[in-house]
Regions:
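Active-site signature of alpha/beta-hydrolase-fold catalytic machinery across serine-
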Residues: 122
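Alpha/beta catalytic cores of group-transfer enzymes, especially the acyltransferase/condensing modules
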Residues: 135-159
Length: 159
C-alpha cells in the first residue's frame, strides 16, 4: 500500500470503569442490570482507505499495543487477533478498497477496563462509514457483542 489514501477515517470509543453487576447481563444469567461508566482514555482506530480496483483487496492491521503489523489473509481467517479479524469479517466492506487499520489504546489490554470491547466498537464504527447506511451507536454496541458471542463463541455481557 504505497499510494496516498483516498480517505482517512478516525473513530474512538471510551474504555469503562465500575463494572457493577457484571456478568448478570449474559444469556445464562437470565436477566440483570449492569452499570458501566465510560471514561477517557479512549480506544482509537484510524483507517486509511485506498483504491484496490483491478486487484485483490488488501487489509493491513497495525495493532500498536502489541507491536504487530500484518496482512489479513483473504478470505478473512481468525489467526493473529481474532477479535479484530472478526470485526472486519462481520462488516460488508466493499471489495474495491484496501484498508490499513491502526488500533491503539492508552489503557493496556487485560486491565479489566473493557479495552477489547472499546477497540471493537471503535473499529466497527469506523468500518460502518465504508458501508451503505449508518448504524446507530446502540447498533454498533450490539454488533460488537455479536462479534464476541456469535463469531468467536465467547461468553460476554453487554459493555
Amino acid at each position: 500500500m504505497t499510494n496516498a489514501p483516498e480517505r482517512i477515517i478516525n473513530a474512538t470509543a471510551p474504555i469503562r470503569v465500575c463494572d457493577l453487576g457484571g456478568w448478570t447481563d449474559t444469556w445464562f444469567a437470565g436477566r440483570g442490570t449492569v452499570l458501566n461508566i465510560g471514561v477517557y482514555p479512549y480506544a482509537e482506530t484510524q483507517i486509511f482507505v485506498r483504491s484496490a480496483r483491478g486487484r485483490t483487496r488488501e487489509i493491513i492491521i497495525n495493532a500498536e499495543n502489541f507491536g504487530q503489523r500484518y496482512a489479513v489473509p483473504m478470505p478473512i481467517e481468525y489467526e493473529k487477533h481474532p477479535l479484530l479479524e472478526a470485526c472486519l469479517d462481520i462488516m460488508e466492506v466493499p471489495d474495491d478498497v484496501d484498508l490499513e487499520v491502526n488500533l491503539y489504546s492508552h489503557a493496556p489490554p487485560g486491565g479489566s477496563t473493557g479495552t477489547s470491547a472499546a477497540i471493537s466498537v471503535a473499529l466497527l464504527g469506523a468500518l460502518d462509514l465504508l458501508t451503505p447506511g449508518r448504524l446507530t451507536p446502540h447498533e454498533i454496541a450490539a454488533l460488537a457483542q455479536r462479534v464476541e458471542t456469535e463469531k468467536l463463541g465467547l461468553q460476554c455481557g453487554i459493555q
